[in-house]
Every structure is written in C-alpha cells, then in structure tokens.
C-alpha cells in the first residue's frame, strides 16, 4: 500500500483518465468541488465547485458526468470547469440524492439515487444519529442521451449507492443499509436478484457501515468499498467473498483501477482524506464510455 495523495476533504468518485491523472470529488461542505490530481500525486488543480459532487463518470467524448447531491442533479462538465445541468428529475420525479454514476454499454447514463435528501440524512458532513429510522426509497435511473428519455429501472432500495456493469454487461447496484449487491437481468434493468453481501459478520461496530462505490476487474472479481467497515471487500464471479483489503481509515467510499498494466486500485477514504493505492492480481475491467 502507498498513499497517492492526501489533504482531501471527504473524497469520492475517483476516475483515472487516459493520461494517468486522477479526478476526484470532495464532498466536504467547505470545498464541494471536483479536483484533478497529477499522475504522480504531487500537484492538483480545482476543476469546478458544484456544491456537493458525489460520483463521476467520463464518456467517450471526454465529458465528465457528475452526480451532484446538494442541489440534486446530473451535470455535464468539461475539464475547463464549464458545467451544464442535464437532469433534475427522472420520469418527472425530482432527484433526492444522486450518488453514483456510470456509462452503460448502450451509451446511456446510469445513476443511483439514494432515496433520501442529503439534508435529511446528514448532520453536517456525517450521518445523523437516527439515520436508521429514516424512510428510504433508493432508485436506479437511466438517461438515454439519444432520445432524451429518463426512466426508473428500480426503486424501493435501502440507500442505493454503488453502480457498475460487469463482464456480462448487465447492471449491478449495491444497497448500503443491508450490505447487499444486486444483479439485474439485463442492461436495461429487469428482475433484480441477490448477487452477494459484503458485511463482515465478525465486525462489531454499531455505526453505519455498508457498500459504497465498486468496480470489476478484468477477471470478473468485484471490488467493493465498505464504508464504516474499513475495507475493500472482494467478491468472485459467483458473489462469494474471497478477500477483504483493510484500508488505513474506516471510511473508504469508492475506488478506481489504475492505468492499464498497473494492476492497482486507487481507494478514496474519508476519515483520513487521502487516496490509497493497493496492488491487485488483474487490471480493471475497461469502463464503458
């Protein structure tokens, strides 16, 4: 393990660009920005302040897609910092907490909405004491860039969070409150089935813990950051836990695979505010763009 960079305020949404630079979001209310970090981790620059940006994705045109959670929306952003609101709603319903985001194999944008507003769930930057009593209607949204249509692929999740497409090109979404990872029957959603669960039965903390951002490697393993549990849990292609990579802090929020050939993951962690790099047996599954 090595520290790639530090002094980040609640980092999330890492994306490694083709030149090896790293995009991250900083959720802390004092920053609320998207930051670009040099490939060696030594320098960084502010791209844009959007409020409380959460997840990021980059499409084939180089457009940065942002799940913005403070003023709930899906944004389009350039490296010059110019942003455009793409969506405030899905199927006419206002977004509550756009959390994570990815590009699908069909070129559409897929977004998890955690199903509760940031202001209702958080006390400052951290979950409020009675978070478990809140009503949650986590949703999965799809935005068709060609026709401009939006629709819900699923709803009723207990804090929809991480989202990814697997080597089978179907959709996977996790649910923070239960620890569950779900697999859908097709790229367009459809029937939901339990793929696996990342909660460690030997972990005795009563604080919030559950899956956050996740990515697949090229050999079909799924790497899931587990907020509050302090690890990246690795599942095999059948959904079985095969490894737990302990992180330096207890609040990892997301990860990205390093450049091709590096066999590394970049893990962003909130408690200590840094990016940690770990070796892996394979490169990441190439992301759809």
Predicted regions and their residues:
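Short, conserved, GDST-rich strand-edge loop motifs in beta-rich repeat architectures
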Residues: 112-135
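Short loop/turn segments immediately following the C-termini of beta-strands
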Residues: 27-29, 69, 114-116, 176, ...
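Short loop/turn segments that connect beta-strands within beta-propeller blades
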Residues: 37-42, 78-82, 144-148, 185-189, ...
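Beta-rich, blade/repeat-based domains predominating
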Residues: 6-21, 49-68, 73, 90-109, ...
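A short loop-to-beta-strand structural motif that recurs across blades of beta-propeller domains
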Residues: 33-35, 73-75, 138-141, 180-182, ...
């Amino acid at each position: 393990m090595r520290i790639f960079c530090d002094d980040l305020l609640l980092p999330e949404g890492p994306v490694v660009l083709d030149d090896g630079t790293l995009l991250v979001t900083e959720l802390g209310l004092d920053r609320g920005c998207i930051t670009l970090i040099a490939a060696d981790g030594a320098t960084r620059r502010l791209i844009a302040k959007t409020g409380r940006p959460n997840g990021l994705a980059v499409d084939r045109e180089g457009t940065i897609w942002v799940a913005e959670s403070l003023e709930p929306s899906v944004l389009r952003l350039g490296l010059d910092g110019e942003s455009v609101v793409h969506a405030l709603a899905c199927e006419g319903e206002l977004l509550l907490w756009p959390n994570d985001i990815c590009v699908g194999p069909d070129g559409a944008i897929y977004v998890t909405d955690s199903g509760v507003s940031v202001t209702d769930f958080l006390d400052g930057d951290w979950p409020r004491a009675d978070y478990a009593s809140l009503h949650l209607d986590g949703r999965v949204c799809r935005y068709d860039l060609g026709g401009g249509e939006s629709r819900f692929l699923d709803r009723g999740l207990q804090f929809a969070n991480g989202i990814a497409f697997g080597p089978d090109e179907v959709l996977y979404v996790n649910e923070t409150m239960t620890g569950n990872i779900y697999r859908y029957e097709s790229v367009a959603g459809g029937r939901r089935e339990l793929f696996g669960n990342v909660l460690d039965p030997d972990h005795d903390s009563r604080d919030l813990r559950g899956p956050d951002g996740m990515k697949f490697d090229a050999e079909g393993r799924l790497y899931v950051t587990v907020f509050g549990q302090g690890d990246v849990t690795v599942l095999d292609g059948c959904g079985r836990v095969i490894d737990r990579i302990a992180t330096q802090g207890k609040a990892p929020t997301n990860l990205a695979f390093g450049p091709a050939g590096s066999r590394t993951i970049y893990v962003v962690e909130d408690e200590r505010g840094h990016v940690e790099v770990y070796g892996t047996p394979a490169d990441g599954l190439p992301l759809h763009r």
